[in-house]
Amino acid sequence: MVTIADYKGKVKPDWCPGCGNFAQLSAISGALAELGIEPKDSVITSGIGCSSNMPEFINLYGFHGLHGRLLPVASAIKWANPKLTVIGYGGDGDGFFEGTQHFYHTAKRNVDITYIVSDNQIFGLTTGQASPTTEIGMKTKSTPEGNIEKPLNPLTIALTAGASFVARAFSGDALHLKEVIKKGIQHKGFSFIDVFSPCVTYNKINTYDYFRKKVYKPNTDTKDFSSAYKLAQQWDDKIPIGVLYDVESPAYEDRDSVISGKALVDIPLVKLTPEHLREFL
């Protein structure tokens, strides 16, 4: 029987006390354990940032990659060994700045991975610059007179790109966060989960209290694209969290004749020929 203790890493997290990433670490570990997935059967990939140190803090296979490039790595791992449960994990700066193109195209392909973004609306590792989700008017080290750029909406991007599972959660509601992650992992196809993760050090606006007053769980038809898109645009007074969109759609691995036939990992190395490799190119 798998327990959450099986996922406890040997390295102690170095996040600031109160960081929303702690709740996400617990939620990811709990979700995998409750689904009966063993550490040896799961992988997490990350880029650069405070949240991207996650592979060091959780006991499963991990790949700490380049800034914004965690999704190509996650996709490659899934294609090489479809039996693995693959999670991509990073921050809003990593995923929505350098990683925007990978985010869009991975969603479009509907690769069977779960992508969790720790969205604190700030660059935390570099001590407080505006990120792609920073709100208009917010003063940061890179926007001392206030941010003049409209924040990016990751949910509408995921929906229009073709993601088959789109959700939002809040680190201040750990049990709900865990359940959303469980649903994302169980979903066959690209699962995107944007998590409000307050940065207690560099973002004094989007705090735990800020989100507690605004978030709510709508009773919605998760098969209805129009409804999901409308909810994804709500922000000012009320912000919906939970699964907004969840539909069945063939995953990339099931549509690719080579990957769906025989996984690369199942071909013995002694028999691996240049012809085999060409099939995967």
Residue ranges and their predicted role:
Residues 129-138, 174, 181-190, 204-217, ...:
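Short, surface-exposed, charged loop/turn segments at secondary-structure junctions
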Residues 45-47, 89-90, 114-119, 194-196, ...:
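Short beta-strand segments
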Residues 48-50, 120-122, 173, 196-202, ...:
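Glycine-rich beta-alpha junction loops
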Residues 38-42, 80-86, 108-113, 118, ...:
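Short coil/turn connectors at secondary-structure junctions
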Residues 3, 83, 131-184:
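Conserved thiamine diphosphate
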Residues 1, 10, 199-281:
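Flexible, low-complexity linker and terminal segments
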Residues 1-124:
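Thiamine diphosphate
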